[in-house]
């Protein structure tokens, strides 16, 4: 769980104010969000939420990087998605009031915004713009999960790395992500299920094809369209 929590309304207003869905709310709904939500600092490798727990919050990554995954008793994991800054997740489980179906772990030290389920449901019923935003989220997330399963089962390692990176640049789910992403080879390994050494070889191959450039704990994308289709032709 989180190490610290921020409830200061002025700070929360600054954080929530950068998101389009919040900007589109009426003033009363904005006050409800600020008055009931919090920001949580989550350290590297810490758990924000666990599978099987009640889905009592809708989450947004203000900065850092989270992964959504399932772990078994031996520690093996299956990663569904990484969530970079600007990404919101968990709306499906909150709407259905079901227990969370995946674990949420911080790959990087992260600042996460938490909106209570009751507030989320109020916004759904009172704000047409918010309802449209959530529907878009659900559609995009479903496509992302299907692609993740396809990638893990059908793609070779180089293509898995490329597609895991490409998912972090979905403009509808992650509008805050620019073409320079702060992520290390080890962190990308957490998302792909590959070793750091294998990720390194894949990134070198992508760099040789001028799709990206590597720097220390940073990757700059040179050709996003090529990254998105890399390795998909055999499918």
Name each model feature, range by range.
Residues 1-12, 92, 141, 160, ...:
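Long cytosolic regulatory regions associated with cyclic-nucleotide signaling
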């Amino acid at each position: 769980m989180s190490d610290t929590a921020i409830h200061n309304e002025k700070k929360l207003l600054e954080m929530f104010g950068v998101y389009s869905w919040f900007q589109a709310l009426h003033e009363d709904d904005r006050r409800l969000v600020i008055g009931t939500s919090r920001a949580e600092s989550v350290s590297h490798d810490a758990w924000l939420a666990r599978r099987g727990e009640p889905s009592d919050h809708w989450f947004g990554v203000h900065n850092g990087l989270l992964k959504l995954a399932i772990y078994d008793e031996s520690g093996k994991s299956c990663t569904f998605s990484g969530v970079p800054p600007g990404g919101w997740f968990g709306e499906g489980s909150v709407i259905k009031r079901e227990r969370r179906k995946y674990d949420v772990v911080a790959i990087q030290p992260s600042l996460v915004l938490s909106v209570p389920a009751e507030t989320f449901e109020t916004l759904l019923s009172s704000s047409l713009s918010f309802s449209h935003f959530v529907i878009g989220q659900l559609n995009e997330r479903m496509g992302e999960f299907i692609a993740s399963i396809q990638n893990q089962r059908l793609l070779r390692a180089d293509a898995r790395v490329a597609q895991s990176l490409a998912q972090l640049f979905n403009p509808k789910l992650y509008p805050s992500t620019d073409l320079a992403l702060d992520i290390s080879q080890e962190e990308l390994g957490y998302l792909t299920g590959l070793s750091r050494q294998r990720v390194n070889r894949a990134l070198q191959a992508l760099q040789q094809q001028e799709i990206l450039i590597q720097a220390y704990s940073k990757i700059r994308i040179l050709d996003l369209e090529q990254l998105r289709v890399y390795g998909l032709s055999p499918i």
